[in-house]
């Protein structure tokens, strides 16, 4: 066959058909075009024949030698009409996969379409104009039929949603990516024993099968069948029911344990830091005043009383004036024993003589010796010239 040259020729041929139809007188318009069906269905990938033929009123059914037919087939898709075949002056032109069933000239104008696709669905129009040898038109007619190309289901995909362990709920899903018309689904269990499922567990439109409260007896091979008017496709999934805890339960327990340990470690660390923060202010030493100097004093192994010494020191501090320099003439304190009588300090003389030194400690023990023996120094209050203690 000769391929169609383009839309320009299509328009010219259509104009020619209209012109020939206008030339035919009404009384001579005896041609009748026959299409037995208004709608046809075919399967994608196959072929279909669009039946069409014409008759002349008062003539035999077979074509006559004087008949000169002009035939054109059009396909309209998305508001655009396209010519798929034409037979004019003994020459046939067509698109790939399109042909006439019978050789021309013939009154049978049936059109064959091969290698069908879904996009070939739509209205097809057949137009015929018959002339005699003198070029006079014997009639013209045009009719249309609808072609619907069906698509069998594409192989579906089966999936298992959920964790199949005893007592759990799972869903088996099945989905076919392409079909025309829409498919319906059916789930069956093949092994170890055959079982067919129905609603409400089965959704025939969405292809889902809900299995609740799983048990070991529900394990097996499940087959999903996707079917429509022109075909069937299937897939399967194997369901194995676990009797132990599910993987999700184990994972949740592990994650919960790790989170608990992390929180416990955080609390311990926080408590430890708070304890250190409370200890640091307590250990700080604040120096408000300078401590008094401690004078060395002799020690005694048998005659020194520590309690009396501490009392003497306390009394001396209480009698000391809080402020001001020491008064003139005050005696310098010397270490002494609390168990012995203190000698009365002498008043300074007016003749300029130096005051007599304090008599040494009885017993012949020096102050250094007393210090080595563990004696505690005692502050002796000074006496003023008036005789009062300072």
Swiss-Prot record:
The gene is ESAM. It comes from the Eukaryota. Pfam families: Ig_3, V-set. Highly expressed in endothelial cells. Interacts with MAGI1. Its main location: other. GO terms for biological process: bicellular tight junction assembly; cell-cell adhesion; homophilic cell adhesion via plasma membrane adhesion molecules; maintenance of blood-brain barrier; protein localization; regulation of actin cytoskeleton organization; regulation of actin filament polymerization. It is a single-pass type I membrane protein. Glycans are attached at residues 108, 169, 213, 236. GO terms for cellular component: adherens junction; bicellular tight junction; cell-cell junction; plasma membrane; protein-containing complex. Disulfide bonds join 174-224. Can mediate aggregation most likely through a homophilic molecular interaction. Keywords: Cell adhesion, Cell junction, Cell membrane, Disease variant, Disulfide bond, Glycoprotein, Immunoglobulin domain, Intellectual disability, Membrane, Phosphoprotein, Repeat, Signal, Tight junction, Transmembrane, Transmembrane helix. It is found in: Cell junction, Adherens junction; Cell junction, Tight junction; Cell membrane. It comes from Homo sapiens. Residues 270-390 are cytoplasmic. Residues 1-29 form the signal peptide. Residues 30-143 form the Ig-like V-type domain. InterPro entries: ESAM (IPR042757), Ig-like_dom (IPR007110), Ig-like_dom_sf (IPR036179), Ig-like_fold (IPR013783), Ig_sub (IPR003599), Ig_sub2 (IPR003598), Ig_V-set (IPR013106). The modification Phosphothreonine is found at residues 332, 334. It is linked to Neurodevelopmental disorder with intracranial hemorrhage, seizures, and spasticity: An autosomal recessive disease characterized by prenatal or neonatal onset of intracranial hemorrhage, ventriculomegaly and cerebral calcifications. Affected individuals have profound global developmental delay, intellectual disability, epilepsy, absent or severely delayed speech, and varying degrees of spasticity. Death in utero or in early childhood may occur. This is Endothelial cell-selective adhesion molecule. PANTHER family: ENDOTHELIAL CELL-SELECTIVE ADHESION MOLECULE. Residues 30-248 are extracellular. SMART domains: IG (SM00409), IGc2 (SM00408). The chain crosses the membrane at residues 249-269.
